[in-house]
Every structure is written in C-alpha cells, then in structure tokens.
UniProtKB/Swiss-Prot annotation:
<feature type="disulfide bond">
    <location>
        <begin position="59"/>
        <end position="77"/>
    </location>
</feature>
<dbReference type="GO" id="GO:0005576">
    <property type="term" value="C:extracellular region"/>
</dbReference>
<feature type="disulfide bond">
    <location>
        <begin position="63"/>
        <end position="79"/>
    </location>
</feature>
<keyword id="KW-0611">Plant defense</keyword>
<feature type="signal peptide">
    <location>
        <begin position="1"/>
        <end position="25"/>
    </location>
</feature>
<keyword id="KW-0929">Antimicrobial</keyword>
<feature type="disulfide bond">
    <location>
        <begin position="53"/>
        <end position="72"/>
    </location>
</feature>
<keyword id="KW-0295">Fungicide</keyword>
<protein>
    <recommendedName>
        <fullName>Defensin-like protein 269</fullName>
    </recommendedName>
</protein>
<keyword id="KW-1015">Disulfide bond</keyword>
<dbReference type="GO" id="GO:0031640">
    <property type="term" value="P:killing of cells of another organism"/>
</dbReference>
<feature type="disulfide bond">
    <location>
        <begin position="41"/>
        <end position="82"/>
    </location>
</feature>
<comment type="similarity">
    <text>Belongs to the DEFL family.</text>
</comment>
<keyword id="KW-0732">Signal</keyword>
<keyword id="KW-0964">Secreted</keyword>
<dbReference type="GO" id="GO:0050832">
    <property type="term" value="P:defense response to fungus"/>
</dbReference>
C-alpha cells in the first residue's frame, strides 16, 4: 500500500509540474504583428485603462476603433492591425 501511495504522489507532482510548464510556455507566446500588449500599451485617450480584460469586448476601450484585431489574451488586450491612415485626428 505504501508503494502505491508513493507512486501516486510522484505522478501527481509530475502532472502539476507539467501543467505549470505548459502555462508558462503559453504566457511566453506572442501573436505576430502585435503593436502592444496590455500594460505596454500607452493610453490613447484619458479614460483608457491599460488593457486589462476578461473578454474580447472589454478591449473596445483599450484599442483604437480602427484596430481591426482587438482580442483579450491572458487578461490583456491585444491591439494590432491598426491602420494609421484611418486614425482620427487629434483634437
């Protein structure tokens, strides 16, 4: 019985370590053609928060509306494919 408990403990630790390494690997990935992510994004207007989100629709206030790609990834807004040609003029 002691051998099976030890084996189960080793398997459990291995599973936890693999989950942690997979999670870290996902956080290191970055989509291509991304101009800025989350806290790296400078505010574009006074009410902008620095990209925290829970779903894609939360990024509407963090990305300029002319950014075609506005996604929530690991609770950070990703704004990309922004064409400066259609950027609003500063007031």
């Amino acid at each position: 019985m002691a051998v099976s408990k030890t084996t189960m403990l080793i398997v459990l630790v291995a599973i936890i370590l693999s989950c942690v390494s997979i999670s870290n690997a996902r956080q290191m990935q970055r989509p291509q053609n991304v101009e800025c992510v989350g806290g790296e994004c400078q505010p574009k207007h006074p009410q902008q928060y620095f990209g925290s989100c829970f779903r894609d629709s939360d990024c509407r206030n963090s990305c300029f509306p002319y950014c075609r790609y506005q996604k929530c990834h690991h609770h950070e807004c990703i704004c990309s494919l922004c064409s400066s040609e259609v950027a609003p003029s500063p007031k």
